[in-house]
Amino acid sequence: MADSQLFCVAEERSGHCAVVDGNFLYVWGGYVSIEDNEVYLPNDEIWTYDIDSGLWRMHLMEGELPASMSGSCGACINGKLYIFGGYDDKGYSNRLYFVNLRTRDETYIWEKITDFEGQPPTPRDKLSCWVYKDRLIYFGGYGCRRHSELQDCFDVHDASWEEQIFWGWHNDVHIFDTKTQTWFQPEIKGGVPPQPRAAHTCAVLGNKGYIFGGRVLQTRMNDLHYLNLDTWTWSGRITINGESPKHRSWHTLTPIADDKLFLCGGLSADNIPLSDGWIHNVTTNCWKQLTHLPKTRPRLWHTACLGKENEIMVFGGSKDDLLALDTGHCNDLLIFQTQPYSLLRSCLDCIGKNSIMLESQISLLPPKLLQQVLKKITFWAAANHREEQRVQKEETENKYQWISSN
């Protein structure tokens, strides 16, 4: 098999969903720009990335397919990927689907959840989801409501008075219990809720659901809040000790320890794509900016998932301001190490990088260890191939830009 086939990668995209379950990263949905047109990625394709071997594979999906969308909210509970909301050619969605990721024959079948109790949220996209006690807990987002549905949890952006439909930002909380198949809204017991927003990000630490940043009207924010997921009380805006990250939207927030959150990228208040990374300690309420991240590879509307050895896997997104120049969608996978790797992982990486020099010794390894080594050899071969392809692509783009400007 040619390297181009063996080392294939999921297509470029932004506004997609990604989750990690076991040894695999799963990617679905999103959109890409082709000749100034927004094209949604196929709804019957799911891509898997083997964390050990570094190989991507595309699988065709069956069942009750969701529409091809961007801005959907994806979350994983007990090996099932749940997709809620999003935006497609027909408008905003409030439909909920799931697919079992733990299949023996790699057959992925979508199911639309229609037999439920309660009332789902109004249609919206760019919302967030906390997973807690087998529940999907949704917050915020941008979408539409009818006049009869207007509440204090909604900031109006635009309206169609003829159809009595309003568009805007939310700050309401909705829960879907996956065991009882029930939608409901919790009674918020106290605290000051965050103002309505979309394109924010969220993460769970213990029994607290954190949110950071996002956009409402023309304002991007850098405030941090949490909701106690047992008592349903808001923290109010958390007072930060020291420096804070810039105001932003379309960023990610990922838990990396019992008391730490990792913030990555986004679009700044002055519409600059960001490449920075920060770690927040929830015990000291301090942010610390990481200085070793690549400054030339900004990302916004990407995904960031935690791997099995606490590495952050950032996939897709855009390197341009989507609101002005919607062309720079990405499909490279950025991996950020947040703690020292195990001795076994370090040894496997060393062998994988130097497999030619160690070729005669590798075959002498015990079978189980040999399989791990062979996967790691494939991992580094794939990584080197993709880096070469990326550099060549950048050189071609830079050459084209130089020719265009001269």
Swiss-Prot record:
Keywords: Cytoplasm, Kelch repeat, Repeat, Ubl conjugation pathway. It comes from the Eukaryota. One of its GO terms (biological process) is ubiquitin-dependent protein catabolic process via the C-end degron rule pathway. Disulfide bonds: none annotated. Pathway: Protein modification; protein ubiquitination. GO terms for molecular function: ubiquitin-like ligase-substrate adaptor activity. It is found in: Cytoplasm, Cytosol. PANTHER family: KELCH DOMAIN-CONTAINING PROTEIN, KELCH DOMAIN-CONTAINING PROTEIN 1. Substrate-recognition component of a Cul5-RING (CRL5) E3 ubiquitin-protein ligase complex of the DesCEND (destruction via C-end degrons) pathway, which recognizes a C-degron located at the extreme C terminus of target proteins, leading to their ubiquitination and degradation. The C-degron recognized by the DesCEND pathway is usually a motif of less than ten residues and can be present in full-length proteins, truncated proteins or proteolytically cleaved forms. This is Kelch domain-containing protein 1. It comes from Homo sapiens.
